[in-house]
């Protein structure tokens, strides 16, 4: 017998809790639909950004995904090994690399994009078009505010004192 649901009333008013719960559900939807293509969320995002924007500096991709440079390098290494992207050294700045889609990466970006266009429908069936648009707008506002004003963590201060 399945246990009754835990009482989460003390968390239910927190935007972060609600957003995390929704994100978990949407990741399940992503895995169910896009998972068979053996794509991770970050890889899907990179493919779509490259398909929509053309070649992009590796640093800009890391910034767009709020990903540390070493983690982006590992992700791009994996994508390169699968034949989806190529990194080309910039002629202007030899320290910089531009990331390009290969033909295989372009096809995969299109296929995954087509799947993504409709995969959220069942999960969002309880929302009207206007509610969906409002949800996206509000989430973007939260993300933009965070990007504009990155709050200092109390851990940052503790690390400085410990050093």
Enumerate the language-model features and the residues they cover:
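N-terminal leader segment of winged-helix/HTH proteins
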Residues: 1-37, 153-158, 163
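Pre-recognition alpha-helix immediately N-terminal to the DNA-recognition helix
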Residues: 18, 25, 29, 45-48, ...
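Short, locally clustered residues in the helix-turn-helix/winged-helix DNA-binding domain
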Residues: 20, 48-52, 113, 140
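Charged, amphipathic alpha-helical coiled-coil/dimerization segments
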Residues: 27, 77-144
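Short capping segments at the starts of secondary-structure elements
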Residues: 53-57
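The alpha-helix within a helix-turn-helix
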Residues: 62
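Helix-turn-helix DNA-binding motif, specifically the short coil turn and the N-cap/start of the second
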Residues: 68-71
């Amino acid at each position: 017998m399945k246990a009754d649901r835990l009482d989460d009333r003390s968390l239910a008013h927190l935007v972060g809790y609600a957003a995390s719960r929704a994100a978990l559900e949407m990741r399940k939807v992503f895995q169910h639909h896009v998972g068979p293509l053996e794509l991770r969320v970050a890889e899907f995002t990179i493919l779509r950004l490259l398909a929509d924007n053309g070649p992009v500096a590796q640093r800009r991709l890391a910034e767009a995904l709020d990903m540390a440079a070493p983690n982006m390098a590992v992700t791009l290494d994996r994508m390169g090994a699968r034949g989806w992207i190529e990194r080309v050294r910039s002629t202007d700045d030899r320290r910089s690399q531009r990331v390009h889609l290969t033909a295989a990466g372009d096809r995969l970006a299109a296929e995954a994009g087509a799947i993504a266009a409709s995969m959220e429908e069942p999960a969002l069936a309880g929302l009207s078009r206007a509610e969906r648009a409002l949800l996206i707008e509000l989430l973007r506002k939260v993300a933009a505010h965070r990007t504009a004003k990155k709050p200092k963590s109390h851990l940052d201060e503790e690390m400085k004192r410990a050093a």
